[in-house]
Amino acid sequence: MLVTPDTYDEALAYIKEYPTWTVDVETNGFNWYDANQICGIGVGVGLEPKTFYFPFRHFPSIDSVNLHPPQLFQLMETMNKCKTLIGYNVKFDLHFLENEGLIVEDKTLIDVIVLIRLTEPSDVREFSLTATIKRTYGEEAAEYDISTKKLLRKNKWYKDFSQAPATILGPYCEKDVEYTVKLYKDRLDKLHETKQKKVFELEQELTHVLYDMEKRGIPVDNNYAKEAAGKILQRQEQIKNRIFETVGHEFLITSPMQVGEALKSLGIESTVKTVKGNDSWGEEALAQVNHPVAGYMRQYRTLDKLRATYLEPYFDMNSVHTTFCNWGTLTGRLSSRNPNLQNLPRTHFKLSDDPLTDEDRDIVRGRISAAVSAKGGTFNNNLSNEVIDTWGFIGDESYNEQEETQISIRRLFVPRSDYTLVSFDYSQMEVRVFLDYFRNDDIDKLLKKENVDFHGEAATLAFGVKEGDSEYKYYRQMAKAITFGTIYGIGARKLGIQLGVSMQQASDYKKQYFKGLKGSQEFFEKVVRVVSSRGWIKNRFGRLYIVPKDLAYKGVNYLVQGTSADILSERMIEVHKYLQDKKSEILVQVHDEIICEIHNTELNDITPNIQKLLQKNSLGIPLEVDVEMCSPSWATKQDFTPISNEPSYVEEWAIDWS
């Protein structure tokens, strides 16, 4: 029903009788935190929903049915009295509605897109409402969406829905509401069938936490963004001139075709081919080339991406309000977008030609090898030191604020005035969860050790080496590679590439590892056997993974990553509850790290308490959480030291009165 000024009172009287509303907003853009607003609100009540569209900001020149501002205020007052709000990607709608007066904090939130993720097979990748409707009810069911969007594009209304008449947008929005309710009912039945009710309840609480994190946002130092981008441009100019001088002519370094032609002029051929059989000049191919020009090309491209992706978009931003998706990954791990904080480089970047030490070169070789093997390639062990030096511009996580030739993307993110960013980082979380799945007396002792080096312990158990032995470092790295290879489902071929050994040697080392780490092989084989026989498996929280039988080897990854993710969610919920009556808040969760913005007056008291809350978990797995202060930005970390609140006194005799 398209609500008009004449039918508004009747519509409001009807919907206010229901404690649960399904909502969908139409907007003139996506930036709820900035310039954009709703142009209309879709509401559905009842399990066989009666739907309404309340138009408020459609252009009057196109449509004269807009309701009046006091009626929007009245609708928000009525919505504030309902107890439960349902939506598809509901946080998006709620941010816009809160800008109009909705009070979110006391509501039960049900995000249907999370329900869809919990009840879909692992090979499903598309979770938009349209894609889900097609997949669930067939192509015809989604025809309303396809035809409406086609009309919106044709009339150039697509980027700003307020330009579209309410008579077109209203029925479209109501249909979205109808299908959101239908999907909720159908998938709720499937959720109960698969006994994932507790998992969904966890996700419901997490939705509140993520909503508050998105709303607060993280401040950005846009002056640093401009400064760092300027430094990169200068460095790119140096590299570009060096490349052109070597090749003998100018060309577009970001063009794979022109790069290929330039390298061929130097007698360099690609050893990597595309699917169509053409020469490839991506990172994997450049890593095979024993010539400095290849390293400089990679350096130029990387710096170009840093500048365009992570610096220039923030020139005019004061804060970032990313979208956290608790439906974005199969395992249950959070993903984020606009921007994707999970992809922010942790390392700093060196904009200079400082020669590397032999130890540094070994580290660089390891990084290149890992990057190449991740794409199924083989690392060229014969790269000269001169070439390796050109690949050494990527540093580690120890960013030096005073070093003019260093930049860090994490340096962009700073605390508000009177606050401190504090990092709570789980130490070797996935390894701990992995070990807990086949916990025995030996593993139990290992898990309960303080400051334990699991990879070193695994090397001792599997290969009989001890710290201080000449080959300890080599076997520790091997144990680490096999541990994560098992968790991520890496086969012997890929493991061999990472270790720089043959496929057979990698297989032999893996067998030795399994033999030394008692219970690990039985666990791995049981997971593969269970998935192969029934096509699904559940993690320790009861989260279901529907896995194609030919991907059974990925089962361990789903269990370990999924359990780690659910522990993080559980603990974030507890920290969020703890902070409700305080000034401090959770800002960001990336991988196994949680960043909180803690008010300086609370820093001493609540930081240790947050650490304790994060270390606890309902599974009883011994976890360690490292605490560091990020000052003056996320890029620079130091051990947590309590701030002294005592006034500083100076003895009178120590003052120079002259």
PLM region spans:
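Conserved catalytic core of nucleic-acid polymerases
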Residues: 215, 320-322, 326-329, 462-589, ...
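Short amphipathic alpha-helices in soluble, non-transmembrane regions
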Residues: 606-614
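Nucleic-acid-processing active sites and adjacent nucleic-acid-binding tracks
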Residues: 48-85, 218
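Acidic beta-strand-to-loop metal/phosphate-binding motif
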Residues: 22, 83-93, 421-423
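Conserved beta-strand -> loop -> alpha-helix junction used to position metal-binding or nucleic-acid-contacting
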Residues: 103-121, 129-130, 451-457
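Short hydrophobic/aromatic beta-strand micro-patches
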Residues: 498, 595-599
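Conserved "right-hand" nucleotidyltransferase catalytic core of DNA-directed polymerases
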Residues: 1-54, 134-137, 141-405, 414, ...
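Short active-site loop/helix that positions an aromatic residue
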Residues: 30-31, 91-103, 115-120, 260-267, ...
